[in-house]
């Protein structure tokens, strides 16, 4: 660190940033996220960095660096530099990893003397969006109380912590090698994927370099798609939200399986050798059965969200397992897992948390363990999926509702609530409806699932029509 004088005047809370912080909570279900140049700017990132540094110093005993990583978006470097300057102004040293998956930032934060970590990414969002995710010293996502303290600082309502030094910025991309090695070590005696042909869709994102290198070092034959960091194409018609290219490649290459990551690689979905998608529900079921057989799943508990398929729930309960649902968002899953002492949880979308190895969702680690699980089983991933459970037909449709009040308070729409009640009456205990406002995009998400596909299609279409007629 370098000596500083009157450091407290280095970062000034400007009125327009204070106004942004006053309007709505900046932190959503997965950090701060928005359109770059509109909601998310370099001046805002700098002040978020400053107040993040202040809050982490107070929570972490006023010593230790902050680990910063980023995905491949064109705006990520700009925002990382702005945020790092704010951290330095708060008297915090910055260890900048450069391109690194979000779980890599969490891992390196936890396994170092860092007081926190920050990831610049908007996960699965389009290239024009970006975000800021903050982690505590233990590598878990920052709790709501500390997020609120950062927001209070941005509003000019927080007192800064006195200091007499500037922080320094150190570019240390080689630290990500420790994260890669930790994934390999977590496999133990099964760290050998020889004989498996695996297709990886890296989504032009944060895992573009690390994941193929890891799987090749484990002995797998790897076919890599979208495997360069490309800020113009990140998540565009590829990755975990667009599986078609991966499915086609698995079939064309005669591969055993494939894995698709999102832009920051904290989630993953799989494709089996028949080209079928394998979502987070199936991954949780298969990994849960393995952990239970190894007596590493306390209470046979799996924690997931309200989005999990009814077929998954009933199949897990049928084998004696405990099935716990939370609100959507991996931070809610993580909190419930910690409260219950559960070791496995996640989301249908591919955020998988295994507390034997990590405190956050980790797409690369999950993919490696699924591949090792298949290798050890002696049968194909397709066969394992067929032996697990039959999911209920499920449809998820998004309705774009720009008006935040209407979107977040959709329950006030009588026509929509009446339509939902009619659907629930019709399906009884053989189906369900879930309507919720997205925490990361201006979308109202409408999900219907039931034993009969015709019912699902009918009620999904009807509910979308009602929402579009009364909320837009």
From Swiss-Prot:
Pfam families: PGM_PMM_I, PGM_PMM_II, PGM_PMM_III, PGM_PMM_IV. One of its GO terms (cellular component) is cytosol. This is Phosphoglucosamine mutase. Catalyzes the conversion of glucosamine-6-phosphate to glucosamine-1-phosphate. It is an enzyme of class 5 (isomerase). Transmembrane segments: none annotated. SUPFAM superfamilies: Phosphoglucomutase, C-terminal domain, Phosphoglucomutase, first 3 domains.
């Amino acid at each position: 660190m370098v000596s500083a004088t009157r450091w407290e005047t280095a970062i000034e809370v400007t009125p327009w940033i204070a106004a942004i912080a006053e309007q709505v909570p900046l932190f959503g279900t997965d950090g701060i996220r928005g359109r770059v140049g509109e909601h998310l700017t370099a001046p805002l990132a700098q002040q978020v960095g400053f107040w993040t540094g202040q809050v982490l110093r107070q929570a972490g005993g006023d010593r230790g660096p902050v680990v910063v990583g980023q995905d491949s978006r064109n705006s990520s470097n700009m925002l990382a530099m702005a945020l790092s300057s704010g951290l330095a102004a708060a008297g915090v040293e910055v260890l900048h990893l450069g391109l690194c998956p979000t779980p890599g930032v969490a891992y390196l934060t936890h396994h170092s003397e860092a007081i926190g970590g920050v990831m610049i990414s908007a996960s699965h969002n389009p290239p024009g969006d970006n975000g800021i995710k903050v982690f505590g010293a233990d590598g878990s996502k920052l709790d709501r109380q500390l997020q609120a303290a950062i927001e209070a600082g941005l509003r000019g309502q927080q007192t800064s912590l006195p200091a007499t030094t500037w922080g320094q910025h150190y570019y240390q991309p080689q630290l990500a090698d420790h994260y890669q090695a930790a994934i390999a070590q977590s496999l133990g005696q099964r760290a050998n994927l020889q004989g498996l042909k695996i297709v990886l869709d890296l989504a032009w994102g944060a895992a573009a370099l690390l994941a193929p290198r890891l799987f090749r070092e484990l002995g797998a034959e790897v076919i890599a798609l979208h495997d360069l960091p490309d800020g113009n194409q990140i998540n565009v018609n590829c990755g975990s939200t667009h599986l078609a290219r991966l499915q086609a490649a698995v079939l064309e290459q005669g591969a055993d399986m494939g894995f698709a990551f999102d832009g920051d690689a904290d989630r993953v979905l799989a494709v089996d050798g028949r080209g079928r998608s394998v979502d987070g529900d199936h991954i949780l079921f298969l990994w849960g059965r393995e952990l239970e057989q190894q007596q590493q799943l306390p209470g046979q508990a799996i924690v997931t969200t309200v989005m999990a398929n009814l077929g998954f729930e009933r199949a897990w309960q049928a084998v004696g397992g405990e099935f716990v649902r939370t609100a959507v968002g991996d931070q809610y899953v993580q909190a419930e897992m910690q409260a219950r002492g559960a070791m496995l949880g996640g989301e249908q979308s591919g955020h998988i948390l295994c507390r034997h190895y990590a405190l956050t969702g980790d797409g690369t680690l999950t993919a490696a363990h699924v591949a090792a699980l298949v290798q050890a089983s002696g049968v194909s991933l397709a066969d394992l999926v067929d032996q697990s459970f039959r999911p209920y037909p499920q449809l998820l449709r998004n309705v774009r509702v720009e008006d935040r009040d209407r979107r977040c308070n959709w329950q006030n729409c009588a026509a929509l609530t009446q339509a939902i009640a009619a659907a629930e009456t019709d399906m009884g205990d053989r189906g369900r409806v879930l309507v919720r406002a997205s925490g990361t995009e201006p979308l109202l998400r409408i999900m219907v699932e039931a034993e009969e596909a015709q019912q699902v299609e009918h009620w999904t279409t009807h509910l979308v029509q009602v929402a579009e007629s009364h909320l837009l």
